[in-house]
Amino acid sequence: MSKNNSKDLTVGSPTGLILGFSLPLLLGMLFQQVYSLMDTIIVGRFLSVSALAAVGSTGSICFLIIGFCQGVCAGFSLPIAQRFGAKDEKGLKKYVGNAGIVSVIIAIIMTALTVLLCGQILTWMNTPGDIYDLAYQYLIVIFAGIPATILYNLLSGYLRSLGNSVIPVIFLIIAAVLNIGLDLLFILVFNMGVFGAAFATVLSQGISGVLCIIYIAKKVPLLHVSRDDLELDSSYVRNLMVMGLPMGFQYSITAIGSVILQTAVNGLGSIAVASMTAASRISMFMMCPFDALGSTMATYSGQNVGAAKFERVKKGLISASVIGSIYSVLIFVALLFIANYLIYLFVSPSETDVVAQAHQFLLINAFFYIPLVLVNTVRFTIQGMGFSGFAMFAGVAEMIARSLIGLVFVPIFGFSAACFASPLAWILADAFLVPAFIHCLHKLQKAKSSQVTSL
């Protein structure tokens, strides 16, 4: 197969390969953050405060549902990466076909359930009556577009499993630019309101999925499947579910902890909410390299486990952790000098209380970025090795930490306690993940390479 369409991560310098694979992912993630910011500005500036509040009120439930779908698709790509590393073309194609069929089933079920329960979900979330209708208009479209979300995430996962991180990012950037243009078209020209904003998101996501289909059809014969590959095989489906469902639940479990923490901060008043919102927006940009390294390690470890190069997995994890740790130190030092200026992008310098609390949140979290590096690199490495269940339990540890801070310590110590929620979550997750990685590596080293996918 052409080197332009795939990348073998089982040979060569781990550090160089990890950097080369993660940089395109980082570019895409940064672009996605810029798009998200622009989308918020468009809704807030060209519609109304109520529209902005309506869209914002659906954020946690979207993270819960859409995150589950994204996690499942990411998990489905892992056995494909393993088969690619093992040079098992027949097994790879069988996983591609079975993952496609299972994804269609999941898309139908998730879409039907969420669309039918959309109104009830908003009621359960205590959505204010004055924005309920707007929130429903937005959320029902997002839920109806779940198939488009699954299409892009599944196919981009296929490509990344073959070591191609560039093409999915190009299509993601195209979708983001298109989304902004469609936002302006649907909101300013067609006066479609929040419905238009949601439709723009779904349509651009669907187009990026179609672009993946076209690219795979023309350029990636390794992902072309036969009718036999589309016939469900219980052993393949079981492995897909064992890897996919824990990753999906991991996203959802993390979302639950974040919702509980946000609810606690909401009780502290508007200044605390504004402070955390501004600091969180900045943190999302700062954390993109960690996410890129994590996604890289899932593919890297998957391919190398498939090739039975277990010691190479360990070397890659060390390289990724060192890269992330160096970045962590540099960004913490930088924030000591520029944190306030970044906060001024969101609030006026005259809002001294907001600036002070946001500054506190940023620096406390940044001080603990090295534990976050390990959360991302170790967790995704374990997932790529085929042990997604362990990674899910780490997500439970994070949820417990954030929930504990939100329910117990925020009411007592206020905003300062909220600043330590994520650091505590990262440390607890690491306390589980590091021993889990050692256990998984030891188990694989004792197993024959032919048994890897059945673990």
Identify the residue ranges that each predicted region occupies:
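Short alpha-helical transmembrane segments in multi-pass integral membrane proteins
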Residues: 1-22, 80-145, 189-245, 301-368, ...
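N-terminal transmembrane alpha-helices
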Residues: 9-46, 60-75, 79, 104-111, ...
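Interfacial/gating helices of multi-pass transporter permease domains
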Residues: 20, 43-63, 129-134, 194-195, ...
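Transmembrane helical elements of multi-pass membrane transporters/channels
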Residues: 20-39, 141, 175, 204-208, ...
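Helix-terminus/linker motif at the lipid-water interface of multi-pass membrane proteins
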Residues: 30, 34-53, 122-129, 185-192, ...
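Small-residue-rich hydrophobic transmembrane alpha-helices
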Residues: 52-112, 149-168, 275-339, 372-386, ...
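Hydrophobic transmembrane alpha-helices of multi-pass small-molecule transporters
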Residues: 64-67, 179-183, 209-213, 285-288, ...
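Short runs within selected transmembrane alpha-helices of multi-pass transporters and secretion channels
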Residues: 73, 141-160, 168-176, 197-212, ...
